[in-house]
């Protein structure tokens, strides 16, 4: 064996060698080191790093309470103790780092979590930039939640830094809800989960370790040690040392063995081995060991000496290897299991007394409240423990360690005497609710806010009840539990009304109405807005009055009262601008554009969305600006500017400021455009994502539009049954709303889809829905869609003449609208009717006009349908459309070179073989194949060959 320090760890050392080498080359990573207690994780990490060439810094977690980010703070302090270079972080971030390291000077206000994370990340990067560095974090099973939540985020930043982080934890101490499991899941999700598992020694390695400690040992003793310890290195070490100290070993022919006839029972556990080894400690040393065990794994020897009532520190513990010296004048037990052994041997009453003494000394010093609280808890002092836990919770929250803060608040509440100071208890519950929200524990937060609301109601505190119901509503909305959220909003409004706070009541009803508007429940929204308007007026809140006007006008426009709705929104906007209310004005600007869109003024809506975007951007209101852009894409798509719409969709999707609403709209519209263009492989995941978000936030318009998009995708991919399912689902969802605008085009398309599929019931159901919308709204756009639908039903009934009249009327009614895709679809269906009536020239004119429109839009599936319809009428495409266009249509959009290549792909040739035969570069062939896959909507070469066969491209045509 080259080095006895690495007994039995060849595999683990090999696993660590690669990330160490990569870190030296500037490519760091996070490596988890897992194994049961005493298996040697710490020894392995330290030995591997000691010869790595990396500067090593250590931090560790301890049981019994700690400050937020404690292991990382320990690392930073270790660096500061030895560093001679400049500051870790400069500029504003230095103040954020001072929240964790007060010795750096003035700290920032609480700030935001992102700034604190960036300060920590930059500090670690600064350390690594000075010298390639390894950070060893030990015993993370005891770490605070904040540290464990930060590590996955750090892992994503290490690949371009000379920084390796080894993080060790006990794998045998992880209950199902342990935060390490969340950390591992997040690392796995992001592709950064790397772990070295440390296993117990086998019999051979155990024997080698025993021989190293005791010298050559008889085989019988080796077997006895292995059988008793199961190869746990710490147990092997302690047991071997205990046997050596017992004086009951003798030398024999095969090595050391137990004395003949000696009754020396082997210890049953590490605890027993440690206590056996400690036999013979002086009274002072035993007192110091007990006090140190109570103080913690890492302790201040001066504090322990004072608690134990000793004049001097007994060096005996150091000599026996039970404790070790640590930086900053501290000491630590050699292993946590050694500390556990001493702690478990302390009588219960003595233990309580020692915890109280430790708490008193810590409270007189500068210890963190979390550590002090733990000693008061174990010292059976609930009042003092509660006070310290509340201070600890506040400290956690100050550095955004909200899970840790919530845990401290819960523990403080568990210690609250029943019936004592109920008002203060409810205040603490409120702080817990806020903490749970910020930690993302929404289920817990909802439970807490319900309890607060019940308590405030019992106390007759209407104001407090309103606040609690408001917070509960916000949490329920985040969970997507909208009906419960709306009920909480109403309860909050009622409580605020009872508390004579009309402004708050109006704000709650406005919030509820805003959601109902998005969900397509316009009448319910208007009912709430009516009451809210009265309360806003009573409170003299101009901002609320302006916003209520904007919402009311928008809701009325969505119900078909276009002119009145637009006038109300304009009045709200004028009010907001007159009083310099920038935020409300931005919101109402967006509502105005939406109202114009619903009133059928697409050019006005487009211009207003552009104006609203500029206004929001100029005033730093980026989330509203992104929403305006997202909504603008709907108008652009409707009016045929698909390229700009797609570009803006991508801009919104990439924006960190986009709300869920904006993201749903942009994702759905981009997927919809790609679907209309035949790029179904890219379209489907976008539409599914949009549908998921829209359902979660109850955005009815996008639920309907994404469902339509998925129907189009299925239709293009040749899955009519699935497409029909989406159409029926669209109808069902519409019936649950009062939506009268965004559903018009989907129903228009679904009517034709059902008709061409021979589904008369689906056709009639869509026509009936459009008839209801047209009656409610009375605008030309829904009337055009209804005429289109009636044309389809007339065809089903066999009345070609009536169908022709209806399609003609549909086209006339569209003349005032810039809706090219809908016009092209109606022209295609009108042409089919005209052809059936023998009016061939008129049919061809419609087809050519529709073809040119769809070609401009890039609507490839519709282009192909129109070209096929022309061919069916005996038209030569090269005459009507131009020779180049006709050839591309015949070839499924492929160029001659692409047709040549797809034929070779179908024979199984590789890109390199094709390149050789056609005297092209492999890269050029690769580009052609990618283009073929996109044009034929294929995922693989086999898909392309199959589609080419269906189009008849694999057999050369005779000229």
Identify the residue ranges that each predicted region occupies.
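Extended alpha-helical scaffolding segments used for macromolecular assembly and cargo binding
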Residues: 28-30, 44-48, 132, 311-313, ...
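P-loop NTPase Walker A phosphate-binding motif
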Residues: 36-66
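Tandem amphipathic alpha-helical repeat scaffolds
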Residues: 38, 341, 374, 391-398, ...
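Alpha-helical sensor/transducer elements of the RecA-like P-loop NTPase core
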Residues: 43, 99, 159-220, 224, ...
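Conserved Walker-type P-loop NTP-binding/catalytic site
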Residues: 70-134, 185-192, 201-211, 215, ...
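Short secondary-structure boundary elements
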Residues: 204-416, 774
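Short coil/turn linkers that connect adjacent helices within long alpha-helical scaffolds
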Residues: 365-367, 379, 399-400, 418-421, ...
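Helix-turn-helix DNA-binding segment
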Residues: 805, 871, 881-936, 943-959
